Swiss-Prot record:
GO terms of biological process kind: 'de novo' IMP biosynthetic process; adenine biosynthetic process
GO molecular function terms noted in the UniProt entry: ATP binding; phosphoribosylamine-glycine ligase activity; phosphoribosylformylglycinamidine cyclo-ligase activity
Gene: purM
Name of the protein this chain belongs to: Phosphoribosylformylglycinamidine cyclo-ligase
InterPro entries, per database record: PurM-like_C_dom, PurM-like_C_sf, PurM-like_N, PurM-like_N_sf, PurM_cligase
Similarity comment: Belongs to the AIR synthase family.
Database matches in Pfam families: AIRS, AIRS_C
EC number(s) reported in the record: 6.3.3.1
Annotated catalysed reactions: 2-formamido-N(1)-(5-O-phospho-beta-D-ribosyl)acetamidine + ATP = 5-amino-1-(5-phospho-beta-D-ribosyl)imidazole + ADP + phosphate + H(+)
Pathway terms, separated by semicolons: Purine metabolism; IMP biosynthesis via de novo pathway; 5-amino-1-(5-phospho-D-ribosyl)imidazole from N(2)-formyl-N(1)-(5-phospho-D-ribosyl)glycinamide: step 2/2
Enzymatic class: ligase
UniProt xrefs under SUPFAM superfamilies: PurM C-terminal domain-like, PurM N-terminal domain-like
Keyword Ligase: yes
GO cellular component term of the entry, any: cytosol
């Protein structure tokens, strides 16, 4: 076989010439190993770097059911690029998945991440992964693996995308599916830390229209920091609450807001009637509504409006649940009740 012909004096090509820096990838792994190590918990078998990550389901479960979730951070990343602020989006990534699986009653066990970029910036990627590890610590799950994909030409320089994957476990007899929710039950609302990770396409449009000084003071911090506040993780206080009383249903308030997420846990024939005066609308949402001219109904179906998690309990358990969650550091309000659905009515109404 004849050797392939090449241009005279042409040098051989390397992967680096094609835009992929293997050495940078190795440097990133070295940087993030200490972050991942801090998240280790019972059940982790082996360390980062294997072809597959191993995890043994804790022996305390008699009939464990695995619960999985995956999500991203959405266009909040575009604001992170604009601000060159990458330290909080990792927690956002973890929160979006662990809060979702928590709703089924699951204890998060482990987490994996996917970081994709056009050109790998080791320091930026390490900052993001450090935030992911911090989110894992807050939720008690192990960061046991991930993928860093450097793909020249796929993303502009300085930009990246994230995806996260969480797996948890719940005792089969303790799965929370909303089937026991009944008329007269109480809807509790746990305060959000801010916008969380949904609605940022509208947020960015409002910023474009208002053209604010993002470095200006906004209630004790910069407007940029208020906008980028990481999604609150509710895992530990709610797992503790489940050990003390019957939690009938939960809804993670993400895309679709209160009016589209609470119905996901209600049986047909039941409606959650929410009182919008039962909790204060945080200043950031007031700012967004004012500068964007956003109608109330649109606010309720795009943003969390200050409520990051809804928890449904019996009326008899409501006060005890509020006391327990407050003692754990959460802000909680009775935001509504469950009643029979009226003809032609949605399953969540805000009055």
């Amino acid at each position: 076989m004849n050797p392939p012909k090449s241009a005279p004096d042409a040098q051989g090509l390397s992967y680096r010439d094609a835009g992929v820096d293997i050495d940078a990838g190795d440097a990133l792994i070295d940087k993030i190993k200490p972050f991942a190590k801090k998240t280790l918990r019972d059940g982790v078998l082996g360390g980062i770097g294997g072809f597959g990550a191993l995890f043994e389901v804790p022996k305390k479960y008699k009939e464990p059911v695995l619960v999985s979730g995956t999500d991203g951070v959405g266009t909040k990343l575009k604001l992170a690029f604009h601000l060159n602020k990458h330290d909080t989006v990792g927690q956002d990534l973890v929160a979006m998945s662990v809060n979702d699986i928590l709703v089924q009653g699951a204890e998060p066990l482990f987490f994996l991440d996917y970081f994709a970029c056009g050109k790998l910036d080791v320091d930026t990627a390490a900052t993001v992964v450090k935030g992911i590890a911090q989110g894992c610590e807050l939720s008690g799950c192990a960061l046991i693996g991930g993928e860093t994909a450097e793909m020249p030409g796929m993303y502009p320089d300085g930009e990246y995308d994230l995806a996260g994957f969480a797996v948890g476990a719940v005792e089969k007899s303790k799965i929370i599916d909303g089937s026991t929710i009944a008329e007269g039950d109480v809807v509790l609302g746990l305060a959000s830390s801010g916008i969380h990770s949904n609605g940022f396409s509208l947020v960015r449009k409002i910023i474009e229209r208002a053209n604010p000084d993002l470095s200006a003071d906004f209630h004790g911090r910069s407007l940029a920091d208020a906008l980028m506040a990481p999604t609150r993780i509710y895992v530990k206080p709610l797992l503790a609450l489940m050990q003390k009383l019957s939690v009938k249903g939960m809804a993670h308030i993400t895309g679709g807001g209160l009016v589209e997420n609470i119905p996901r846990v209600l049986r047909e024939g039941l409606t959650a009637e929410l009182d919008q005066n039962a909790w204060p609308l945080p200043p950031l949402f007031k700012w967004l509504q004012e500068h964007g001219g956003v109608a109330d109904a649109e606010m309720h179906r795009v943003f969390n409006c200050g409520i990051g998690m809804a928890v449904i309990v019996s009326a008899a358990d409501a006060d005890a649940a509020i006391a327990d969650l407050t003692a754990a550091g959460e802000q909680v309000w009775k935001i509504g009740t469950v009643r029979a659905t009226r003809e032609g009515e949605a399953q969540t109404v805000v009055v």
